[in-house]
Amino acid sequence: MSLMIDVESLKVGATTLIHALQLEAHRGVVHTLMGASGSGKSSLLAAVCGTLAPALEFNGRVALDGELLDHLPTERRRIGILFQDDLLFAHMTVRENLLFAVPPGPRAQREALVQQALHDLELPGFGKQDPATLSGGQRSRVALMRALLAQPKALLLDEPFSRMDAGLRSRMRDFVFATVRSRDIPVLLVTHDEEDIADRAHLTRLPAPV
């Protein structure tokens, strides 16, 4: 399985953010996308998952495992996304946040998946807690696991470590990369930080907009 992105152009008004770009994120690989602010990195992720703002125009193709996604609604693309802000639901417990993402099925099975997720997060016993009581690193880990519990076929990471201090950033980077690789899905990471690059053999740098 791979995520293929072929961009003819990505524009906002008369400004071309991205032109003639092709990249492929392979299964089990974290492909890193870098570029200056305003180069279209986050907008490209929005185009991939189907949430591009009306002010932007995307011309190109997005395919996952050979299936074109361009005309599918966001919910049918099966692509997860993790932002720099964890965006946990404040009115839900940690357990409820995780359960929200689990696909429909027998309740006992869904609950078992949540308990296993809490174990994998090294947060057993945290299920009943309010997300506001968690540390920044714990919240980020819960947000990642929530994205993965939805069983995405690919995952987009939009500056997920940018608000963390150096020590936490390093630990979270290792945790995220190990976790997504174990799921064997293609991953596209947007970052400004050279230290976030997962593998320089899978790196795309965007030029400045024209």
Segments from the language model and where they lie:
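Conserved ABC ATPase signature
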Residues: 130-134, 138
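ABC-type ATPase nucleotide-binding domains, specifically the catalytic core motifs of the NBD
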Residues: 53, 73, 92-111, 120
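Catalytic Walker B motif of ABC-type/P-loop ATPase nucleotide-binding domains
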Residues: 155-159
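A short, proline-enriched helix->beta-strand linker immediately N-terminal to the Walker B motif
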Residues: 149-153
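ABC ATPase NBD coupling module
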Residues: 67-84, 104
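Conserved ABC ATPase "signature" region
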Residues: 109-126, 177-178
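Hydrophobic anchor residue at the start of the ABC signature
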Residues: 144
